[in-house]
């Protein structure tokens, strides 16, 4: 007997499916009509500019593969609905390759936020916001982009950023709702919120991802206790890494017998090497995490530690909660 999704779970699944549709369109794998987009949808992108209309948006995304193959993968996904309005966000890492010379390649990363509306034909994306912050490789493949990202960060004369987390994040567009009932989904969404906050420098959003007694190892800075010390150090650290993007997957989670805590392992994706030769997900490091469900019903991290070392889905590390190594 299969479990049918109902209510918020059904909406969340439908919104996550829209992420897959966008990634397929960006990879050039969606040649048909852009039925996942509202006909009057809008795009704001620091790569593609401002566009209106479903077909123009799909064409602009597909054009990134005009000189060869464009492959876009996603991680750090979040989706929620409030009435007939939905929001979603995800990280995208893409690879552009030249058809005639596979050695000419460009790897890039982006943060994407979607707004969607419930229609008689299902959920449709009404707005796409794409903010790319880094790229590596042959810049010739990105000559059609308006503002190819660089590691230099903001410079005098730069246009305003496309994405301002305090205004445009899913949690700014909608109030944080009740976490999913499924523990894996709930902790996965918590990590997506945390990573969005730290990578965008949204300190208020980051504060809400930690308990007041957060502790652990924060490589390369060291071990800290308490939200004051942790947030202060992370804010200062983040200033020097404007292109930071914590691509990651939740790979293991277990509920604590007390019903209020959960242990989790999150694998850090390295976009340059996301798969094994056999096609299995590959990770370059992992986080040992402990989360607590607090009185407001929200999960927050209360302990964390970062561990270097490669592993795949057949060799996921064991739990080692409470032992800080940073």
Give the positions of each predicted feature.
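Short N-terminal micro-motifs specific to bacterial/archaeal maturation
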Residues: 6, 24-25, 48, 197, ...
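Active-site-adjacent bridging/hinge elements
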Residues: 168, 200-201
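Short, aromatic-enriched amphipathic alpha-helices that serve as compact interaction elements
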Residues: 10-29, 183-199
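Short, hydrophobic/aromatic alpha-helical segments in well-folded domains
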Residues: 21, 111-115, 190-194, 233, ...
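Short, structured motif recognition centered on aromatic/hydrophobic residues
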Residues: 17-19, 23-24, 123, 128-130, ...
């Amino acid at each position: 007997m299969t479990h049918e999704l109902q209510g918020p779970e059904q909406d969340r699944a439908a919104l996550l499916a829209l992420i897959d549709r966008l990634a397929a369109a960006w990879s050039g794998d969606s040649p048909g009509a852009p039925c996942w987009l509202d006909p009057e949808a809008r795009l704001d992108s620091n790569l593609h500019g401002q566009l209106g209309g479903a077909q123009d948006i799909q064409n602009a995304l597909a054009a990134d593969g005009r000189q060869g193959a464009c492959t876009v993968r996603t991680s750090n996904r979040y989706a929620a609905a409030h009435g007939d309005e939905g929001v979603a966000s995800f990280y995208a890492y893409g690879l552009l390759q030249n058809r005639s010379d596979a050695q000419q390649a460009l790897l890039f990363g982006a943060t994407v936020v979607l707004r969607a509306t419930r229609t008689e034909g299902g959920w449709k994306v009404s707005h796409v916001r794409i903010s790319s912050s880094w790229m590596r490789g042959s810049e010739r493949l990105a000559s059609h982009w308006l503002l190819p990202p660089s590691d230099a960060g903001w410079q005098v004369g730069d246009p305003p950023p496309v994405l301002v987390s305090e205004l445009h994040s899913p949690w700014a567009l909608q109030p944080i709702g009740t976490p999913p009932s499924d523990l894996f989904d709930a902790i996965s969404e918590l990590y997506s919120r945390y990573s969005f906050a730290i990578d965008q420098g949204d300190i208020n959003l980051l504060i809400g991802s930690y308990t007041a007694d957060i502790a652990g190892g924060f490589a390369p800075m060291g071990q800290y206790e308490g939200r004051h010390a942790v947030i202060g150090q992370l804010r200062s650290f983040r200033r020097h890494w404007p292109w930071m993007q914590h691509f990651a997957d939740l790979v293991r989670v277990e509920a604590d017998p007390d019903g209020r805590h959960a242990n989790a392992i999150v694998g850090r994706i390295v976009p340059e090497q996301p798969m094994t030769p056999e096609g299995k997900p590959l990770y370059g490091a992992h986080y040992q995490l402990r989360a607590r469900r607090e009185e407001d019903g929200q999960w927050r991290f209360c302990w964390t530690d970062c561990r270097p070392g490669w592993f795949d889905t057949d060799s996921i590390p064991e739990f080692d909660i409470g032992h800080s190594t940073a």
